[in-house]
């Protein structure tokens, strides 16, 4: 019997739909059709040079060539009873790829990259040298029984069909018999060893030294395109959903900004600030014309360096929109804009900008905007989402697939999602990489990346800009060492020199009613005198000539109270280096008379209204209003006032709070920080980047200079308290258990973060370096630009001399060791696990339903459980792994034992040996562990 060769059997659920010409009579997907479509898709996804597209076309058209074996054809029809390995198909496809590309005289890099991409199109990429010299070479030996059985079976059953598949790429006229003769000659083994091994007396020895240069870059590129093309067609995702992406537009942003500028400013300072923001935005747009207007095939990285508070988000987006307009002027497909931020904890506020009804009113579950971080529901519904509680399996799977593959016009994500997908990605992580092909990436505050990764990040940026032709815009409030060894173009510098005369893009751009002359980049810093810095004596304790004198949390709390109370008034932000330090400062602050913490009011409102924080439709603003009224801060007339018996209102923010509660806290802080309410927010450094809040004064525990400047960016952000009306105090807090801060015996929290390496790899004498720079300022108050510009530059120059970055990532990339790269992570330090925190009856019911789904014997229930687990992101909190290990009564959400496979997510409903308290710092063990002591954020 001769089967029609198929790639996938008929779908049992009837959900997958293909054109009739791609199907057999029984509804199965034809192998020829699948290989053809995957080849077409992959070459459309790939935006590289035409020569490389032809090589990729060969690989993609042969990716499932191995499915032509009778063994696989029996297996796919549930009729196979032979040896397990003989039904595998990827390596035979890889062998055919090498054969055809060798005939086409493809360079060694392309030939090996395409072969590896096909061999691993269902898996993650391997360490290339070892896999090529050993796994592939052994599999292709003429004595290999699996290969022999597959070759013989095809020759006996349907050699003509194999010939048809082989020639489908259009790059060979060889027949099956010619291919088989070549395989049986054994020459391929020597060819593989030639590019992956050195010859020794004992035989070939795998070595990365023999690999073609930049093999990892090209392999990743081919593999990602084939993987996405293969999966999208296998899942029957509509072609238009893969390629025709919708996006947010610049025109709407221009109209929004025009409307803001039409509103009369409150005073001259606000008018001047608005003009500075708009001047910088227009200047950056002009800079894009210079950046992309040259002949360079690989444009340098564009930098946008502006003081905090000068509108980098809108300026960066405007520049990216303009760049996309230039690149798409030839009528090509829409390029995604990927906007990457440092932390999950701050991404929601940036997301809210895109969701503003008066701006784009974007819905991240629909097309145009995708939000992707580990707590988000990452989906793209191209059509209306079904109204039932659970949409069809097909619709849900497509939406999830499109979301994780970033098949959308605008993507808001984290550095972790972006860079870890380039470093030994899993098969699923690799789906998103084609969105970077000839695309645009905005890096918002890249200096927040771990310093030991900086060398690796520059190598990854090189991969993006040279292999993927990605245009990168790096936005910073400082200019870090990270970018000093790569070619960059300052959008503000070249925008200032841009000649608009004869510029076609300027001619078709918006016609602004008021002309704003461009300015020197330094002028923006000089004009942005929002704060004065004061260096506390304790911040100089690490200087060589200074005595160690730290500040107790008790003394720090007293100073915060004195600064915030009625005499001074206004709002205060106190940033600590660890969660334990922030909890201790909160406790000391609340010990003062007249201090009221908002945690109780938040708890009360959530409980009284039985709020389910897993629901997307929750109205955060309405809940915040109820909290303010419950606490007596907002009266029946809607006005804010201080209730009787209260002198200061306090809130605490860190990563141990649920994401939903963090959203509440940020909106509360946004409401109170600019009011006349004496308000204190105690936070960890999670608030420093991307959180658009403004306080009258900021206290910052000693930190790297760029972190101090980021803290200053939360102070007098829009001149609410006049020019230079904000104050930033830098001090050193003692260990919470230190008995004598004036003569300390314990290391301060800053030591554990910046020298022992809770956030970075640990930098010896780091605090000494920081203190020595701060010690140069003898005046009681230091001007803004002296710290934000000059001191920061000096700091990064000093760091550069220390050679902080590890070369490990770069070396592994250059050696094409994808398997080892997969074990590297941007999130250093301790291991964590996630806990779903239920505080209301509705949430406890939701957790119980989730556990019932995971413990069900019905696979459909478990599938539903995974979807509902994603939807529970709003109540998901990370804890150090060893904290959970010491709390045996905390159970897993899937009901399994801790050492079993399954869903490694835990549950808290209020009865376990955990506690969740909005007043004392969020989720922690009732007897907190040592691990929680030095946790940052």
From Swiss-Prot:
Q: Which GO biological process entries does UniProt record here?
A: defense response to virus
Q: Which SUPFAM superfamilies match?
A: HD-domain/PDEase-like (SSF109604), P-loop containing nucleoside triphosphate hydrolases (SSF52540)
Gene deleted: what happens? Loss of the 8 Cas genes in this locus (cas1, cas2, cas3, cas4, cas5, cas6, cas7 and cas8b) leads to loss of CRISPR interference against plasmid targeted by this CRISPR locus, i.e. plasmid is not destroyed by CRISPR. Disruption of this single gene also leads to loss of CRISPR interference.
- Requisite cofactors: Mg(2+)
Quote the protein name from its UniProt record. Answer: CRISPR-associated nuclease/helicase Cas3
Family, per entry: In the N-terminal section; belongs to the CRISPR-associated nuclease Cas3-HD family. In the central section; belongs to the CRISPR-associated helicase Cas3 family.
Q: Give the binding site residues for Mg(2+).
A: 64, 122
Q: Which organism is it from?
A: Haloferax volcanii (strain ATCC 29605 / DSM 3757 / JCM 8879 / NBRC 14742 / NCIMB 2012 / VKM B-1768 / DS2) (Halobacterium volcanii)
Which keywords label this protein? Answer: Antiviral defense, ATP-binding, Helicase, Hydrolase, Magnesium, Metal-binding, Nuclease, Nucleotide-binding, Plasmid
């Amino acid at each position: 019997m001769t089967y029609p060769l198929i790639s996938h059997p008929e779908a049992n659920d009837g959900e997958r739909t293909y054109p009739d010409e791609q199907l057999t009579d029984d509804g199965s997907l034809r192998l020829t059709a699948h290989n053809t479509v995957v080849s077409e898709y992959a070459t459309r996804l790939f935006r590289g040079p035409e020569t490389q597209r032809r090589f990729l076309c060969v690989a993609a058209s042969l990716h499932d060539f191995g499915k032509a074996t009778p063994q696989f054809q029996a297996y796919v029809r549930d009729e196979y009873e032979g040896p397990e390995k003989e039904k595998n198909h990827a390596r035979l496809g890889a062998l055919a790829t090498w054969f055809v590309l060798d005939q086409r005289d493809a360079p060694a890099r392309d030939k090996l990259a395409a072969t590896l991409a096909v061999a691993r199109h269902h898996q993650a990429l391997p360490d290339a040298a070892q896999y090529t010299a050993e796994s592939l070479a052994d599999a292709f030996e003429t004595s290999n029984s699996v290969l022999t059985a597959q070759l013989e079976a095809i020759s006996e059953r349907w050699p003509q069909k194999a010939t048809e598949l082989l020639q489908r790429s259009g790059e060979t006229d060889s027949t099956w018999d010619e291919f088989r003769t070549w395989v049986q000659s054994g020459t391929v083994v020597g060819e593989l060893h030639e590019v992956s091994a050195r010859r020794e007396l004992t035989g070939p020895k795998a070595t990365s030294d023999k690999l073609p240069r930049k093999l990892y870059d090209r392999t990743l590129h081919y593999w990602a395109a084939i993987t996405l093309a293969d999966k999208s067609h296998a899942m029957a995702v509509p072609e238009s959903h893969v390629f025709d992406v919708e996006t947010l537009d610049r025109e709407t942003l221009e109209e929004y900004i025009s409307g803001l500028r039409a509103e009369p400013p409150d005073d001259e300072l606000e008018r001047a600030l608005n003009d500075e923001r708009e001047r910088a935005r227009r200047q950056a747009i002009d800079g894009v014309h210079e950046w992309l207007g040259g002949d360079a095939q690989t444009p340098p990285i564009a930098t946008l360096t502006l003081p905090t508070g000068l509108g980098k988000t809108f300026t960066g987006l405007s520049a990216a929109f303009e760049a996309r307009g230039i690149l798409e002027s030839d009528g090509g497909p829409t390029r995604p804009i990927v906007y990457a931020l440092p932390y999950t904890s701050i991404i929601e506020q940036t997301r809210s900008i895109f969701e503003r009804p008066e701006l784009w009113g974007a819905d991240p579950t629909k097309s145009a905007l995708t939000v992707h971080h580990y707590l988000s529901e990452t989906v793209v519904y191209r059509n209306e989402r079904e109204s039932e509680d659970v949409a069809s399996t097909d619709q849900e799977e497509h939406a999830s697939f499109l979301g994780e593959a970033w098949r959308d016009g605008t993507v808001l994500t984290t550095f972790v999602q972006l860079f870890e997908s380039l470093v030994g990605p899993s098969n699923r992580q690799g789906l998103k990489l084609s969105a970077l092909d000839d695309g645009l990436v905005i890096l918002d505050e890249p200096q927040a990346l771990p310093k030991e990764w900086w060398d690796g990040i520059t190598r990854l940026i090189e991969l993006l800009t040279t292999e993927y032709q990605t245009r990168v815009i790096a936005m910073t409030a400082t200019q870090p060492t990270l970018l000093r060894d790569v070619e960059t173009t300052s959008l503000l510098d070249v925008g200032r020199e841009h000649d608009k005369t004869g510029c076609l893009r300027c001619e078709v751009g918006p016609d602004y009613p008021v002309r704003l002359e461009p300015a020197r980049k330094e002028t923006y810093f000089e004009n942005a005198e929002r704060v004065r810095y004061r260096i506390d004596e304790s911040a100089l304790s690490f200087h060589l000539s200074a005595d160690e004198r730290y500040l107790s949390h008790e003394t720090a709390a007293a100073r915060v109270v004195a600064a915030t109370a009625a005499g001074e008034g206004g709002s205060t932000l106190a940033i600590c280096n660890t969660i334990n330090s922030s909890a201790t400062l909160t406790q000391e602050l609340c010990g003062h008379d007249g201090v009221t913490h908002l945690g109780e009011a938040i708890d009360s409102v959530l409980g009284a209204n039985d709020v389910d924080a897993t629901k997307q439709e929750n109205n955060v603003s309405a809940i915040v209003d109820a909290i303010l009224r419950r606490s007596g801060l907002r009266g029946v007339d809607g006005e804010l006032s201080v209730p009787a018996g209260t002198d200061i209102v306090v809130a605490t923010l860190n990563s141990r709070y649920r994401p939903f509660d963090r959203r509440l806290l940020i909106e509360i802080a946004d409401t109170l920080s600019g009011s006349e309410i004496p308000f204190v927010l105690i936070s960890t450094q999670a608030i420093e980047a991307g959180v658009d809040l403004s306080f009258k004064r900021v206290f910052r525990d000693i930190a790297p200079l760029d972190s101090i400047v980021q803290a200053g960016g939360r102070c007098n952000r829009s001149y609410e308290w006049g020019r230079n009306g904000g104050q930033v105090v830098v001090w050193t807090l003692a260990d919470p258990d230190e008995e004598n801060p004036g003569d300390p015996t314990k290391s301060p929290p800053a030591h554990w973060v910046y020298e022992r390496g809770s956030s970075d790899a640990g930098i010896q004498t780091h605090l000494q370096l920081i203190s020595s720079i701060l010690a140069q300022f003898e005046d009681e108050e230091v001007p803004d630009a002296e710290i934000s510009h000059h001191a920061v530059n000096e700091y990064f120059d000093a760091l550069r001399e220390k050679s902080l970055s590890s070369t490990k990532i770069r070396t592994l990339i250059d050696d094409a060791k994808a398997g080892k790269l997969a074990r590297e992570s941007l999130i250093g330090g301790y291991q964590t696990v996630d806990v779903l925190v239920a505080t209301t009856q509705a949430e406890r019911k939701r957790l119980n339903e989730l556990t019932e789904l995971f413990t069900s014997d019905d696979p459909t229930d478990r599938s539903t459980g995974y979807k509902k687990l994603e939807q529970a992101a709003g109540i998901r909190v990370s804890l150090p792994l060893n904290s959970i290990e010491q709390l045996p009564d905390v159970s897993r959400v899937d009901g399994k034992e801790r050492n079993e496979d399954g869903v490694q997510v835990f549950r808290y409903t209020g009865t376990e040996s955990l506690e969740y308290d909005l007043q004392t710092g969020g989720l922690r063990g009732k007897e907190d562990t040592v691990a929680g002591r030095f946790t940052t954020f």
